[in-house]
Amino acid sequence: MLIIEYDGTNYHGWQYQKNAITVQEVLEKAIEKVTGEKVNLIGSSRTDTGVHALYQVANFKTKTKIPPEKLPYALNAVLPDDVVVVKAKEVDKSFHARYSARSKRYRYLILNRQFPMPTMRNYCWHVPYPLDVEAMKKAAFFFRGTHDFSAFKASGNKKVNPVKTIFDLTVEKEGDLIKIEVEADGFLYNMVRIIVGTLVYVGLGKIKAGEIPAIIESKDRTKAGITAPPQGLYLVRIVY
């Protein structure tokens, strides 16, 4: 099992794609270079283009004699600077980085001031209009619990179960930065970014906090807010 951090700016997400560079591909090539083995790396979360990870977990099968504690040093020597393996450890054969996870936690950063910040342009969503953070906090409360989150998913695989349990959803402001964190037993495609976009609409007064339960009940994507851009999103924790 590997614990990985990466800056997603220059990658077309986690999952392997034929004609685009991805984090999975870069890591698999590094593992092959170090161990001489072609592996299939399974990630806990298939992050999208531009999304970052402070705690991604991945597993693969290997016969390498390199001790797990030495593996991060070997891999980091051949990986690009924007992908780092911070830990490696041996796990049971039944372990699956994605399906063994009990919960995942994401963080989203919003820069809420008149002008953008050049050094943060790839790491947050710049919203130039003042946001009512207290209203956003009230709205966040209604997302907690077990619901059908069909109104908060992008069109895609309709066979995926839309019922998810959100254990925690917080909104905090520190200076010009608004930090939104959400933890759940699983997420639908773009669910976190649509929840963030909806909270921003609440902050702008376009949606009232008290309307959130009705939006959830509607199961209608058009009733929710916009999809927040990817660069403000970070995978921060996986619980097994």
Swiss-Prot record:
The entry's keywords: Isomerase, tRNA processing
TM regions (residue ranges): none
Keyword check for Iron-sulfur: no
Residues binding substrate: Y106
Single GO biological process annotation from the record: tRNA pseudouridine synthesis
One Gene Ontology term of the molecular function aspect: tRNA pseudouridine(38-40) synthase activity
Annotated coiled-coil segments of the chain: none
Stored Gene3D superfamilies: Pseudouridine synthase I, catalytic domain, C-terminal subdomain, Pseudouridine synthase I, catalytic domain, N-terminal subdomain
Active site: D48 (nucleophile)
EC number: 5.4.99.12
Pfam family name, one: PseudoU_synth_1
Catalytic activity from the UniProt record: uridine(38/39/40) in tRNA = pseudouridine(38/39/40) in tRNA
The protein's assembly and partners: Homodimer.
Family note: Belongs to the tRNA pseudouridine synthase TruA family.
Record function comment: Formation of pseudouridine at positions 38, 39 and 40 in the anticodon stem and loop of transfer RNAs.
PANTHER family: PSEUDOURIDYLATE SYNTHASE, TRNA PSEUDOURIDINE SYNTHASE-LIKE 1
Protein name as it appears in the record: tRNA pseudouridine synthase A
Organism: Caldanaerobacter subterraneus subsp. tengcongensis (strain DSM 15242 / JCM 11007 / NBRC 100824 / MB4) (Thermoanaerobacter tengcongensis)
